[in-house]
Amino acid sequence: MPVTSELILAALLLVGVLAKSHLIAAAACILLFIKLARFDLAFNFLEQKGLELGLLILLLTIMVPLANGKISERDIIYNLTSIPGLLAILGGALATHLNSQGLQMMQADPAIIFGLIIGSIFGILFLGGMPVGPLMAAGIAALFMEFFKYTK
C-alpha cells in the first residue's frame, strides 16, 4: 500500500495528539480536511501567503504589550541600553538571519519539513519544548548543515 499524503497527515494528527502538541495536531487536521474536501485553492493560498499571515499574527501577539501600554518608554530605553536588552537585539538579529537560511533550505528541499516536524515532536516530548518556530528549526538545521560541510 503506497503512503499517501492523507496517511501522512493522519499520522501527524495522531502523533500530535499523543505528543500533546495541539498546534501540530490542529495543522495536520486542517490540512487533512482541506485535502479530503478537495479545496485546492486553500493549498495555493497557504503556500503563497500562509507564512506571512502566520508571522503577522505572531508579531501582532508579541506587540500587544506595546499597543496596550504595558511597556513604558522607560522599559524600552532600558531594554535598548542594558546587557539583557543588547543581547536580545543580538539574538533577534541572529534569529532573523537563521530564519532566512531556514526558509531558503525549506524552499530548496520542501521534504525537509517532515524532519523538522519530527524534531519538533521530539523536542516537545523530551525537552518540554513548544513548536512555534519551524523557520528557526530550519535555520538551525541549515547552520548544522553548513558546519557539517566545513568539517568534512
Swiss-Prot record:
It is found in: Cell membrane. GO terms for cellular component: plasma membrane. The chain crosses the membrane at residues 14-34, 51-71, 76-96, 112-132. It is a multi-pass membrane protein. It comes from the Bacteria. Keywords: Cell membrane, Membrane, Transmembrane, Transmembrane helix. InterPro entries: UPF0756_TM (IPR007382). PANTHER family: UPF0756 MEMBRANE PROTEIN YEAL. Belongs to the UPF0756 family. This is UPF0756 membrane protein Daud_1310. The lineage of its organism: Bacteria, Bacillati, Bacillota, Clostridia, Thermoanaerobacterales.
